[in-house]
Design a protein with these regions (language model features):
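Short clusters of hydrophobic/aromatic residues that line enzyme substrate/ligand-binding pockets
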Residues: 38, 131-134, 231, 276
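Glutamate identity and glutamate-enriched acidic tracts
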Residues: 6, 44, 56-59, 69, ...
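Basic, nucleic-acid-binding surfaces and adjacent catalytic neighborhoods in DNA/RNA-processing proteins
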Residues: 17-33, 47, 146-281
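Phosphate/anion-contacting hairpin/loop surfaces
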Residues: 63-183, 188, 200
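Gly/Gly-Pro- and Ser/Thr-rich, intrinsically disordered tail segments characteristic of DNA damage-repair
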Residues: 1-116, 278-281
Length: 281
């Protein structure tokens, strides 16, 4: 998401918002300010906080966008007027001094799959909206201090997915981080030794830094939906562990699955697959 925000900033910073079309009614989570209130204002910069894209305008209003798991951004030059399947919103910007004139450039937010979870907010000055209460991110002193001192009893996979505990990781990178740290996803922060806590800090920092470096090198559009090739463990069930070669296993939940290496993470033990256990009852 950091690399995406950097590409958007390079593309659109300084451009004027011509219009913001709501294409998926339930995706907009605020009613005031209205999207039209930003029309004619200049986009100053695009940044990121956790899994959210933050667009700051010259009137101190902002748009916050969350693509969720299956969202993507498509550049349209010139902007289109169609409403493709899964369309969430379309933003049209005027470039340079053209301002509100000329065809400009369109940015289509589109969601693939059956679930509709992509969301956006229009926030007034001082309103943090969904950014309130987000946890620290890997690579920061706050993150390292949290890992070193937390006595959380929750499973590591749960804490790493909870954006209000640790932000910017999520389930995909969480699988890769726990394998790199040689930690069971069902262990808790409270149960870790000081050495294991340091291993988790190092793994999180390294995995996220490597992911950002790779994404910055990627060419093409602005899609964030095709991250399968970025992960080394997540989504690779049945394939060999990138470190030891052991077949990666899964634990299935209602709406997602978690991948892990039995040799690297659980001393050879296979964790109970929740979905399979229910079927066998």
């Amino acid at each position: 998401m950091q690399a995406l925000s950097e590409r958007l900033d390079a593309l659109l910073a300084g451009a004027t918002l011509r219009k913001a079309d709501l294409l998926g009614f339930s995706s907009l989570k605020t009613y005031a300010p209205a999207p039209d209130d930003l029309r004619g204002h200049r986009l100053e910069h695009v940044t990121r906080r956790a899994k959210y894209l933050v667009w700051d305008f010259d009137d101190s209003n902002r748009i916050v966008l969350h693509l969720s798991q299956a969202g993507r951004l498509d550049i349209e030059e010139p902007p289109k007027k169609t409403k493709p399947r899964g369309a969430v919103a379309r933003f049209v910007f005027g470039q340079g001094d053209a301002g509100l004139d000329g065809p400009g450039i369109g940015l289509l937010v589109r969601e693939y799959g059956t679930q509709r979870k992509a969301s956006w907010w229009v926030l007034g000055p001082g309103d943090e909206g969904p950014l309130v209460g987000l946890g620290p991110e890997p690579g920061t002193d706050e993150f390292a201090n949290l890992i070193r001192t937390s006595d959380s009893k929750r499973q590591l996979t749960t804490d790493l997915r909870d954006q209000h505990v640790v932000s910017g990781i999520g389930r995909g990178w969480g699988d890769d981080i726990l394998q790199r740290a040689h930690l069971s996803p069902f262990a808790s922060l409270r149960s870790l030794t000081p050495e294991q806590r340091e291993a988790l800090i190092t793994a999180a920092n390294d995995v996220m830094a490597e992911a950002l470096d790779l994404e910055r090198k990627r060419k093409g559009g602005l899609s964030e939906s095709s991250l399968g090739g970025r992960f080394k463990v997540h989504g690779k069930v049945g394939e060999p562990c990138p470190e030891c070669g052991t077949k990666l296993e899964r634990v299935s939940f209602e709406s997602y699955e978690m991948a892990y290496c039995p040799s690297c993470q659980t001393s050879g033990k296979k964790l109970a697959d929740r979905r399979l256990s229910r079927l066998l009852k």
